[in-house]
């Protein structure tokens, strides 16, 4: 295995600074490994010429002792729903197959300014509508932890940011950018055994992220450690004049305390009883219990809490998701945006044929359902009711994070991320998209509904040798404590994200 893959981003950039390694060498090896592991289908498009140019510029900065930031020369992959200047951005859909943006998403431009090396675009579910990265026009993405990548018994990478998660887990890059609307960064992080961060809504700009659900979409970060996630977050977070939903105040870069410097006796951990739900595997439950005990033994206060509207959240999320999808997808008419059909007998026919050819069945179903729910006769009964329940869900979190009594108040919530280990592709694909998301998003989408930060961290391997992960959530803009506790857990469990016999899969 490439020795530097075991290093953190800080260790990597230190090796650049002292001349032990060079950005060009690391980039070349990343491009080579990405080709050798093409069977994963993590990347839909590599950009080798751009990456080599960025690596060369980074190397020159290090030679002058003038690196741009702590990310200078670090290889990063970008999900294919973030606009990248002069590089195709397709959302893994025929509708945008020929779209080449003339500008960068803010996340991408800030990474470039930080000196990062952008390797290419990663696979995803079409328009991010899925939880498995299985319905892309480029084919499904495989999980590097699969027992056998060549047979029909391989495991899904999760979704919809499965390409970025798979690339990070396989060591093809040091970090990946995903999006997270209902768990699309944390879900694949859980299945692929990496860290997946969903920041507070508004902390990271959505400018240039092709929208799915404007009120919930958040750029996400995938990396092999919590510290690496922090390095990327520090580069991309903060106000953006191009996105009116970003925070107004300047972002203060996070500096996590040393693991031994975190006083857990001042931290209160909540265990939401509603997350002990149907379908939760015995191994995930056991992992959840052991980590709660680990925190308690180290001095943290651990108590059960209630989030009473959790059971309704998946239904509310589904309604709001489909309504916003119907609105956002209306722009793709074959004239202003998107694939254009050859049939131009009439404007109506052109619209209909372009959308029929450009969208897959999953996208069409959500559009149709969303438009039905938004009909005048249904608007109050479905959409407005869902908005009211969404407010109640957000208030559930406020009540536990900001309870008047200190005894009832918690700082962090500890839950499962996914209910099971990564399922086999053949089992997952036998379910409808609706059923897939109902299972996969149960534990993750409430954080999006409330706009709070959440992070998934790998804990251990299942008896089948697959990663099992847990999720931490906290109040808005409390990433400092959230990630400090996550890093403490990470240090205790010492999970190796690269312990999947990569050499055998490269040979």
Swiss-Prot record:
Gene that encodes the chain: GatA
Top-level taxon: Eukaryota
A Pfam family per the record: Amidase
List of catalytic residues: 79, 160, 184
InterPro entries named among the record's database cross-references: Amidase, Amidase_dom, AS_sf, GatA
Xref: Gene3D superfamilies: Amidase signature (AS) domain (3.90.1300.10)
Signal peptide segment: none
GO annotation terms (biological process): glutaminyl-tRNAGln biosynthesis via transamidation; mitochondrial translation
Localization annotation: Mitochondrion
E.C. number: 6.3.5.7
GO cellular component terms, A-Z: glutamyl-tRNA(Gln) amidotransferase complex; mitochondrion
Alphabetic keyword roster: ATP-binding, Ligase, Mitochondrion, Nucleotide-binding, Protein biosynthesis
One Gene Ontology MF term: glutaminyl-tRNA synthase (glutamine-hydrolyzing) activity
Catalytic activity annotation: L-glutamyl-tRNA(Gln) + L-glutamine + ATP + H2O = L-glutaminyl-tRNA(Gln) + L-glutamate + ADP + phosphate + H(+)
Organism, scientific name: Drosophila pseudoobscura pseudoobscura
Organism lineage string: Eukaryota, Metazoa, Ecdysozoa, Arthropoda, Hexapoda
Stated family: Belongs to the amidase family. GatA subfamily.
Protein's UniProt name: Glutamyl-tRNA(Gln) amidotransferase subunit A, mitochondrial
Biological role stated in the UniProt entry: Allows the formation of correctly charged Gln-tRNA(Gln) through the transamidation of misacylated Glu-tRNA(Gln) in the mitochondria. The reaction takes place in the presence of glutamine and ATP through an activated gamma-phospho-Glu-tRNA(Gln).
Subunit text: Subunit of the heterotrimeric GatCAB amidotransferase (AdT) complex, composed of A, B and C subunits.
